[in-house]
Regions:
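Alpha-helical transmembrane segments of multi-pass membrane proteins predominantly involved
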Residues: 1-487
Length: 487
């Protein structure tokens, strides 16, 4: 078959974000010997420009919506939403990284190149229409993330977190790939739409094989989104990794993994939903409960936010349990809101942690409202959104998820989710009380002024959080139009 029959100009346009990110990641590596890393922010500037170009490329690719490369990729509203989201997360990761890398004397091209490669993998995950392409995107993103977690080579905590992340991540990937093998063996295809057709056809394979495949993939993806009972890696990795990397891991890879979670289970496995639904609601309940109650006992803010991340994965799993387009749209909205509020909170942690990241405890935030009222106000917005207070993105995110659950008659799961949200309010409010009601700690008393990059890293997520809380309809409308995944 001629290459021209497989690849055309439209295919290149649909693949544009991944091309830009991959090429620019390589360009950064080539420029490393040329640029004076100690006196220049050039790596960060090039990375930001690359991400902005990829963002524009994602929007432009949507004008050529359709399948690419023989159906291996699909550019639709769902893919575009998550492409834009993970690239935005990348931009918000680079902004606080300027000071962090300079403070740790760790400014190299590798950091930014790995970030671009990881985001390229996440974009591929969002647009993949075949299980093998999903696997490739997953591995590109994961391998880059493993290295980023251990980027500070002289930090024992970072090395330990990277090793745990790599070992457990590889184990989870094995489960996912084994599930792919079961699906291919039973249906003869790895195309998601073709798998759906095979499971609904007259010669549908044995439900035993497809059920095992769904369970294996659930285990692999459950690890990637840090959902219970596969969450054990998250607190240690989030605490040990460099804080900007932790912010990135908590938002970008999680959003991309949920994108393929919904793409696979709401497309390929939709005909056997009665089989996998119990797995999802059990995981949702465990994630919300374990995450929130474990967070109550944390003194380290990064560990607290790690357990909070587990709980928020549970809320998204509630949307998946709903098994509806409304639930998918609600999850899309929630992941966008969560990305803004979580990455903003980690940006504040990065700002206060100091050289060597020694200030990470809740008590270290004492007096922040007195010493840096703007920083405290930004963190307050993020924490209130994580609670789900009205006029924030977190409120409408939870509202739409629980609304979708009620429409699917999941009353008991909705009630338990609301109770868990009440529990979560305690540990978020505790941090607010410490910031405003206590005398300044050494960390806040000696905190450096906000740099331009950090100001942007705080104001942009805060703006996104408030916009989604005050004007949620424009995002929700697009998510609603993009939520029907069965092609």
């Amino acid at each position: 078959m001629p290459v021209s029959n497989f690849v055309n100009t439209a295919d290149i346009i649909r693949f544009l974000p991944e091309i830009i990110l991959s090429v620019m990641g390589t360009v950064l590596m080539v420029l490393d010997p040329i640029i004076n890393r100690r006196s220049s922010n050039a790596f960060g500037h090039i990375t930001l420009l690359s991400l902005v170009a990829a963002l524009i490329g994602s929007v432009y690719a949507y004008t050529e919506a359709g399948t690419a490369f023989g159906g291996m990729l699909v550019v639709d509203g769902f893919a575009t939403f998550f492409r834009v989201l993970v690239i935005a997360v990348g931009i918000l990761t680079v902004l606080p990284s300027y000071r962090f890398l300079r403070r740790q004397d760790a400014e190299t091209s590798e950091y930014h190149a790995l970030l671009l490669y990881s985001i390229a993998g996440q974009c591929l995950m969002a647009s993949a229409n075949e299980l093998i392409m999903i696997f490739l995107g997953l591995e590109i993103s994961s391998i880059s993330s493993y290295i980023l977690a251990g980027y500070l080579r002289d930090d024992k905590r970072a090395n330990e977190s990277a090793l745990k992340y790599f070992l457990l991540g590889s184990f989870a990937t094995g489960f996912f790939l084994y599930g792919v093998a079961f699906i291919y063996g039973s249906t003869g295809t790895v195309n998601l739409s073709a798998v759906h057709a095979a499971l609904t056809g007259p010669n549908a394979p044995s439900p035993v094989f497809t059920g095992v495949a769904a369970a294996l993939m659930f285990v692999g993806l459950g690890f990637k989104v840090s959902a219970s009972p596969f969450q054990v890696w998250a607190p240690d990795v989030y605490q040990g990794a460099p804080t900007p990397v932790t912010a990135f891991l908590s938002a970008g890879p999680k959003a991309a993994a949920f994108a393929i979670f919904f793409r696979i289970f709401m497309t390929a496995f939709a005909p056997i939903a009665n089989g996998w639904e119990p797995l999802v609601w059990i995981s949702a309940l465990l994630s919300m409960t374990i995450g929130n109650f474990a967070a109550l006992m944390q003194a380290n803010v990064k560990r607290l936010l790690a357990y909070s991340s587990i709980a928020h994965a549970g809320y998204v799993m509630v949307a998946l349990t709903a098994r509806s387009d409304v639930g998918t749209a609600a999850a899309m909205f929630y992941l966008a809101a969560y990305a803004f509020m979580n990455i903003g909170a980690f940006a504040v942690v990065s700002h206060l942690s100091g050289k060597g990241e020694k200030y990470q405890n809740v008590d270290d935030f004492a007096g922040l409202g007195q010493k840096q009222p703007v920083t405290a106000a930004m963190l307050s917005i993020f924490l209130l959104s994580l609670i789900g207070v009205p006029l924030t993105g977190g409120f409408f995110g939870k509202f739409y998820i629980f609304k979708a659950a009620l429409e699917s008659h999941l009353v008991w799961l909705t009630v338990l989710g609301l109770l868990n949200s009440a529990v979560a309010a305690y540990y978020y409010l505790r941090l607010l009380v410490v910031m405003y009601m206590r005398e300044p700690s050494d960390a806040t008393a000696n905190a450096e002024p906000l740099t331009l990059g950090l100001r942007a890293a705080l104001f942009l997520p805060a703006l996104g959080t408030l916009v989604l809380g005050i004007f949620p309809s424009w995002v929700l409308e697009f998510a609603g139009k993009s939520s029907n995944l069965v092609k």
